[in-house]
A protein has these predicted regions:
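Alpha-helical multi-pass transmembrane bundles of energy-transducing inner-membrane proteins
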Residues: 1-15
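Membrane-interfacial helical/loop segments at transmembrane boundaries in membrane proteins
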Residues: 53-61, 134-161
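Hydrophobic alpha-helical transmembrane segments of multi-pass small-molecule transporters/permeases
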Residues: 33-39, 72-79, 121, 125
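Alpha-helical transmembrane segments and their membrane-interface junctions
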Residues: 38-53, 121-143
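Alpha-helical transmembrane segments and their helix-start/interface "positive-inside/aromatic belt" motifs
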Residues: 23-32, 107-123
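Alpha-helical transmembrane segments of polytopic integral membrane proteins
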Residues: 3, 51-52, 83-87, 91, ...
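Glycine- and aromatic-enriched alpha-helical transmembrane segments of multi-pass membrane proteins
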Residues: 114-132, 158-171
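Predominantly late transmembrane helices and immediately cytosolic-facing juxtamembrane segments
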Residues: 68-108, 168-171
């Protein structure tokens, strides 16, 4: 959605042509950077929780030896790509010198264009800070029909300690 706002307000979504938008669109830049940080899996945002859960599943899978060894490595590499594209978007679009050859002079969008992004960024924060309260009941309701019995024990928490998924996140 942030890319759509940027495209609408600047006339392009070509990342090679965009830079310095934080000076012209500071509020939109802040929203986009929080969303980008969530995609990168930064702690206290929803993406961190989902990334940790994904990493945990790759570490604790029971399969053939080569799958058990390769899957966490592949997942870690995929995680680094998420960080890379999130950083590239943030740095290239919002920082650096102001772009000079854009079809339109960028400015903050109308309120109605920001509301959906604001709601999603708020959801990223709420899920990241209060995972058990915000998505715990929904996850249990969705998993129950699939499992068909008692759900296995799981924890939706901000911190699970220093473990393999956390080390994978740090890489």
């Amino acid at each position: 959605m942030a890319a759509g706002i940027i495209d609408h307000e600047s006339g392009t979504r070509d990342i090679r042509k965009l830079s310095g938008l934080i000076k012209l669109m500071p509020y939109t830049a802040t929203l986009a950077m929080v969303a980008s940080a969530a995609m990168a899996g930064v702690p206290l945002l929803n993406g961190f929780l989902s990334k940790e859960m994904f990493f945990a599943e790759t570490v604790f899978i029971t399969s053939t030896a080569w799958v058990e060894a390769a899957l966490p490595v592949i997942a870690t590499i995929a995680g680094t790509f998420s960080v890379a594209y999130s950083l590239r978007f943030t740095v290239d679009v919002f920082f650096g010198p102001k772009a000079t050859r854009l079809p339109h002079t960028p400015h903050e969008p109308p309120r109605w264009m920001r509301v959906p992004v604001e709601l999603l960024v708020l959801a990223c924060l709420i899920v990241g800070i209060f995972p058990a309260l915000s998505v715990g009941p929904l996850l249990a309701a969705a998993a129950q029909p699939v499992v068909g019995g008692t759900l296995p024990e799981y924890s939706l928490a901000i911190w699970h300690g220093w473990n393999a998924p956390m080390i994978m996140s740090l890489i």
